[in-house]
Amino acid sequence: MNLAIPNPNSHHLSFLIQNSSFIGNRRFADGNRLRFLSGGNRKPCSFSGKIKAKTKDLVLGNPSVSVEKGKYSYDVESLINKLSSLPPRGSIARCLDIFKNKLSLNDFALVFKEFAGRGDWQRSLRLFKYMQRQIWCKPNEHIYTIMISLLGREGLLDKCLEVFDEMPSQGVSRSVFSYTALINAYGRNGRYETSLELLDRMKNEKISPSILTYNTVINACARGGLDWEGLLGLFAEMRHEGIQPDIVTYNTLLSACAIRGLGDEAEMVFRTMNDGGIVPDLTTYSHLVETFGKLRRLEKVCDLLGEMASGGSLPDITSYNVLLEAYAKSGSIKEAMGVFHQMQAAGCTPNANTYSVLLNLFGQSGRYDDVRQLFLEMKSSNTDPDAATYNILIEVFGEGGYFKEVVTLFHDMVEENIEPDMETYEGIIFACGKGGLHEDARKILQYMTANDIVPSSKAYTGVIEAFGQAALYEEALVAFNTMHEVGSNPSIETFHSLLYSFARGGLVKESEAILSRLVDSGIPRNRDTFNAQIEAYKQGGKFEEAVKTYVDMEKSRCDPDERTLEAVLSVYSFARLVDECREQFEEMKASDILPSIMCYCMMLAVYGKTERWDDVNELLEEMLSNRVSNIHQVIGQMIKGDYDDDSNWQIVEYVLDKLNSEGCGLGIRFYNALLDALWWLGQKERAARVLNEATKRGLFPELFRKNKLVWSVDVHRMSEGGMYTALSVWLNDINDMLLKGDLPQLAVVVSVRGQLEKSSAARESPIAKAAFSFLQDHVSSSFSFTGWNGGRIMCQRSQLKQLLSTKEPTSEESENKNLVALANSPIFAAGTRASTSSDTNHSGNPTQRRTRTKKELAGSTA
C-alpha cells in the first residue's frame, strides 16, 4: 500500500502563512530606543504544561453545508459532504469504509483544511483521533500541524499541546513546522512567554527555527507587550543565526512602533529595512504614517520618502497615497498638495486613487471649483478615472447641492464605459431625491432595470424622495410597493421619505396608512416619524392631532429636536395662537438653540396676522443684529426692502442658492415660511419675487401648469401666505393672457390632494377655505368647488372671460394692469400698536401654560 507523502515545505508553509496573523493591533507599553547591534535580553519563562481550554460551542452536523462543486476531487468532495452531514454521535468509521485505500494523506489534508476554514474543530478532532487508530491513514506531521493550527485558532491550547505531545508516541517526528504551529497557537492567544520557551525548547532539540518561526514569535511578543529591548533581542538573535529578516519582520516591528508611538525607533527600522534591500509595501507605509501621525510629525514621512527618491530608490505610488490619506483625514489641504507636488517632482505618476483622495479632500472643504479643475487635470494627464473616482465626485457634488451636475457625471461615466456599481446608483439617486429631479431618478431606475440590476433599499428611497419632492404621490407609492416585489425591504429611511412626502402635502390619511405599515413591520417610531406626522397634521389642518402627536412623542420618551420644535411652532403659527408661538420661540432660545430662519419668519407671520407691529419691528431688529447667521441678517434686510434693486438682490440670490444646496425638503419649508411672513407684513410684491425665485430653483414644480384646455395652480403644499401669493400671480397671469386674447377652457385651483379630495370634507381644509375666500373677494363668485372633487375650485372659460372683462379694478390695480394688486406696504413703525399684557399673556409659568394648551387642543374636536 502506497501512501502519498506531501512535500512538507510547500504544504506546511502555505497553511501557516494563511492562518498566522503577523501584524497585531494591541496596546503595548512604551519601549526604549532602537539598538540593532545589541542582542537584547529576555527573561526565561517556566513552561506551565497543560492549560485550561476555552469553552467552545458544539458544531452539529448540517447537511445543508456542502462543499463547492469542482473544488476537490470526487472522493474528497464526497467525504467532506458525508462528514458534514454526520450527526454528533455518528460513526466516523462507517463514513470512511468506502474510502479505504482510496484517499492519500494529501487528500485528508484537504479535508482538514476545509473544516479548518469552517472553524469545525470538533469534527476535525474526531476524524483525527480515528486516523490515529488506523494504519492505512495514520496522520503525518503535515496533518498534525494543521490540527495544532486549527485548535490554536479556536483558543484550545490544552488540546493543541495534547496533539503536539502525542507526536513521538505516534511515531511522528517534530519539525520546525509543528513547533511553529504551536508557537503561533500560544502567541495568538496572548501567551508570548510560552512562545518564547517553545523557541528555546526547539533549539535544545536541535531543530532550527525558520524565518516564519521568528516572525511568529516576534509578532506574539509585540502583541503581548514584551518591551522594545526584548523585541530587538529577538531581531538580533535571528540575524545572528543567519536568518535574514523579511518584509513581515520589519512590518511587525513597525507595527509595534506605531502602537507604542516610537517615532525615532520606527525611523531607524525603516532605514535598516531600506539598507537591507527590502522593498516597503502598503503595510510598511501605513505603519509609518500611523506612527508619525500620532506624534503629529507626518512631515517626517515626507522627509523619508524624499531621502529614498534622492538616493535612487523611488518610492512607489502607494507610499504617497497613504501619506495623502493621512493629511486628508486631518483636512490639511496645503500639506496634501505639498505631497502631491513632491511625488510629481520625484517622477512618480499619480493614479486614480491619488486623485480620488484629493478630490474628496477639496469636496469636503467646499472647494467645488478646485474639484472640477483637479478632475479636468486628471483626465488631461491620461489618468483614467475609475468607478471609485466617480463615486467620490457624485457624493461631493450631491452633498454640495449640485444635483444636476451629479446626473451629468453619470452620463459622462457611461460614455467612458466605466461600469457603475451600487454605490454609484445610490449616490446619484440620492442626489436626485434631494434635488427633486424626479425625471432623472426615473430614468436611472429604468437604466438599472434594463441592465438587470436590482436597486437597493437606499436607491429606492432616493427614487421615492424624488417623486415626493415633486408631489408625485402615486409614483412614490408605486416605487414603495415595487420594493416588496423585487425583495428589497424598506428601511426606516424609506418609510420616513414617504411619510415626509405625504406630510408636505397634508395627505393625512396616506400618512397614517404608511405609519401603520411601519409599525406592522416591527420598526420602532423615532424622532423623524413623529416630526413627519406633526407636519402632516399641520398641513392638513388637523391642529389638535398635531399637538396630540407632540404630546405622545414626549410620553414615549422620544426627545424632540430642532425640527420638532419648528414643526410645533408652525402649527401654532398656522392656527394663529400667538401666545403659544411666543412661548415656543422663547423656549428654543432659552435652550441655547438658535431658532432657524423659518422660525423667525413664522413669528413675523403670526405677528403680522394679528397686527402686532411692535413685536414685528423688535424681531426684525433681532434678525439684523444676529452675529451668528448671515442668513438671518440678509432675509431680515430683504423683508425691510434693503435689497430691492437688482444689484443688491444678488445678495439675496446667493443666500437662496446656499439654502437650495440643502435640498428641496428644506427649501419648501423655508419658502413657505418666508412667503407667509412677507404676505402678512404687506410685502406682496417681494413675496411674488421670492415665489419666482423658488420656482426658478425647482421648488413647487406642480404649482403652475398650462395646456390648451386647462390652466391650473396647485397650492396644496403651500402656507397660507404662500397660497395667497401664488393665487395672485396666477390670476394676474390669466388677466395678461386675456388681454392677448388667449384663455383656457378651464381655470382650476388645486387646494387638496390625496384621498381627502374625493370627499366634500376637503372643502373644510384651511387652505381650501382660504383659497376659496380669496377668489370670492377678488373675482366674485365665478369660481366654485367641483362636485366630483372636493379639493378643486374651478371656473369655466365663458365665466372667466365675462368676469375679467367686467371687473372694476382699483386705482392701484389699474395702474399696474393687474387683477390683484401686488405692492409693498410700509411696515408700521414701533409704537403704532404696542403689545399689552392682555395680548401676550406673559404671566404664569410658560411650561405649565404650554402643557395646558396642548391638553386643551388635544382634547377638543375639530
Swiss-Prot record:
Family annotation (SMART domains): SMR
Tissues/organs with expression: Mostly expressed in leaves, stems and flowers, but barely in roots.
Free-text disruption phenotype from the record: Lethal without exogenous carbon sources. Decrease of total chlorophyll content as well as a decrease in the chlorophyll a:b ratio. Unequally expanded grana thylakoids. Altered expression profiles of plastid genes.
GO CC term, one of those recorded: chloroplast nucleoid
Cross-referenced Gene3D superfamilies: Tetratricopeptide repeat domain
Similarity section: Belongs to the PPR family. P subfamily.
The name this protein goes by in its record: Pentatricopeptide repeat-containing protein At1g74850, chloroplastic
Species: Arabidopsis thaliana (Mouse-ear cress)
